[in-house]
Amino acid sequence: MPFPNCSAPSTVVATAVGVLLGLECGLGLLGNAVALWTFLFRVRVWKPYAVYLLNLALADLLLAACLPFLAAFYLSLQAWHLGRVGCWALHFLLDLSRSVGMAFLAAVALDRYLRVVHPRLKVNLLSPQAALGVSGLVWLLMVALTCPGLLISEAAQNSTRCHSFYSRADGSFSIIWQEALSCLQFVLPFGLIVFCNAGIIRALQKRLREPEKQPKLQRAQALVTLVVVLFALCFLPCFLARVLMHIFQNLGSCRALCAVAHTSDVTGSLTYLHSVLNPVVYCFSSPTFRSSYRRVFHTLRGKGQAAEPPDFNPRDSYS
């Protein structure tokens, strides 16, 4: 919370957030582990699109692996037991994995937009090896952007507190940097995703006018709409809560600030939900992933492996 002397952690809010984080951890680890296995062992023909999705799965898997520590933090009413270094490491990995995930979501949207709307551009000839190089640069850039804001993540003198990501009022460089970066991390990817997906839909509507092609158009529309809705659902509430936090910091109302701080805790935990929902997008976009998740689902239900659909092609690719 931004002002420890103004409000104490809410037991109800902390417990709810801790339980939600625990669920996100379990589902995120399972879904993204299956996605990673599918990428490594079942996708045979690689394109840049698949490389970016692989990196997205890695970022989501890293994020999900960090969530047990954050869940324990909330379930213990925000008491921290892993020291200053542990606090720094948790903040770094959470912020990095979330930033990288958002960057690769934008990269996927841009790649699809260029291939569908501007298919003759030379950038569409990018090889998988070049896409790996681009992915490495994205990771390095996000590391460089994440580090300056980590000065905020310092434990208290007794090493039993680990300040949250949410804004505080001291106006230091690290606070300003982190808030500006958080704003850009939402606005830029969201704007790019909306723009690219709208362009894809317009292009497909012009090309798929025949009645027999309408089912393909409808599937494409559903997929791009799903991507936009999931992004907004997970990140927009947290973005708005941070805006409200800045507003109420200047009003001097401790009660209002407490309510907004608790809202920030809840909406902040929702941003990690995207690591759980991204595998839904994989499943929606490829029969290979539908087959993998179907196998896991039937195994968990004790029914053994599901039969492959008649039109299943194990040499699936992303074009």
Curated annotation (Swiss-Prot):
SUPFAM superfamilies tied to this protein: Family A G protein-coupled receptor-like (SSF81321)
Those parts of the protein on the Extracellular side are: 1-16, 74-91, 153-180, 241-265
UniProt keyword Transmembrane helix present:
yes
**CDD domains this protein is in?**
7tmA_GPR31 (cd15199)
What GO terms are given for molecular function?
arachidonate binding; bioactive lipid receptor activity; G protein-coupled receptor activity
Assigned keywords, A-Z: Cell membrane, G-protein coupled receptor, Glycoprotein, Lipid metabolism, Membrane, Receptor, Transducer, Transmembrane, Transmembrane helix
Q: According to Swiss-Prot or TrEMBL, what is its membrane topology?
A: Multi-pass membrane protein
In the UniProt record, which residues carry a glycan?
N5
Q: Quote the cellular component terms of the Gene Ontology held in the record.
A: plasma membrane
Tell me one Pfam family matched here. Answer: 7tm_1
Q: Could you list which ranges are Cytoplasmic topological domains? A: 38-52, 111-131, 202-219, 285-319
Q: Tell me where in or outside the cell this protein is found.
A: Cell membrane
Which Gene Ontology BP terms does the record give? G protein-coupled receptor signaling pathway; lipid metabolic process; negative regulation of inflammatory response; positive regulation of immune response; response to acidic pH; response to ischemia; response to molecule of bacterial origin
InterPro entries tied to this protein: GPCR_Rhodpsn (IPR000276), GPCR_Rhodpsn_7TM (IPR017452), HCARs (IPR051893)
Q: What induces or represses this gene?
A: Up-regulated in prostate cancer.
Q: Which residues cross the membrane?
A: 17-37, 53-73, 92-110, 132-152, 181-201, 220-240, 266-284
**Protein family:** Belongs to the G-protein coupled receptor 1 family.
Summary of subunit composition and partner proteins: Interacts with KRAS; in a farnesylation-dependent manner.
- Protein name, please? 12-(S)-hydroxy-5,8,10,14-eicosatetraenoic acid receptor
Biological source species: Homo sapiens (Human)
Lineage, uppermost ranks: Eukaryota, Metazoa, Chordata, Craniata, Vertebrata
